Amino acid sequence: MAKGYKKDEIINKLENLKDISTLYKEDFINYRGYTIDTKEKYTEVIAEWLIKNFNLFDNIKKITRQSSYKVDTHDGKHNNQNSNRLEEIMAIEIFNQKSLNILGKVLDYQTPLKNERDDKAGKIDIVSYNKDIKTVYLLELKKEDNEETMLRCVLEIFTYSKTLDKDKFLEDFNLSKDTKIKASPLVFFNSFQHKEMVEGDNKFLKQLMDKLDIEPFYITKNSNYYAII
């Protein structure tokens, strides 16, 4: 991001947004730094505005997938070493290790949300289930050197969770209807997102995360084993 922006310019971008379900894809969600007039973090300006306009999230449309959310052909194998698909490969590695400590058993990876080709929806990187607390986790995985803002990660996985037909999802995974569904970013310990949360002033981002019921988890990798810390 070469140029700086005033607070009103950032708010104007938000007010001109046509589709809240694609907000997480907007370039300005990843702006790092401070407004040139009020010296507020760009992410804080955005988070505060979203808190004040929280009802906009109700406009995210649920997509009911006619095919199963659980993809039977997901066998834990991949043939593509393309670095652009590193997060997908990592998700498969986590699937193959079967569990993710406090997040429970890993049920699937790259879980599709689209029903039709033109649907504006991505894929859930990892689905896990902790049977002790009857909670299924929808996890948005980011590779270690990813430099997206935590705000972007939060908005992405929250949008996916709102898009999901939760009743059908639970049925497809043979989970009881009273299973709690929790959406979370899954980022590396000491990553940009982790440092952003522990080192900076993120009052409004944290308030937004509380309202969205989004909690990030931090992951490490040792000897090809992934663990939550």
Regions found by a protein language model. Give the residues of each.
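Charged, terminal alpha-helix-loop-beta segments
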Residues: 1-229
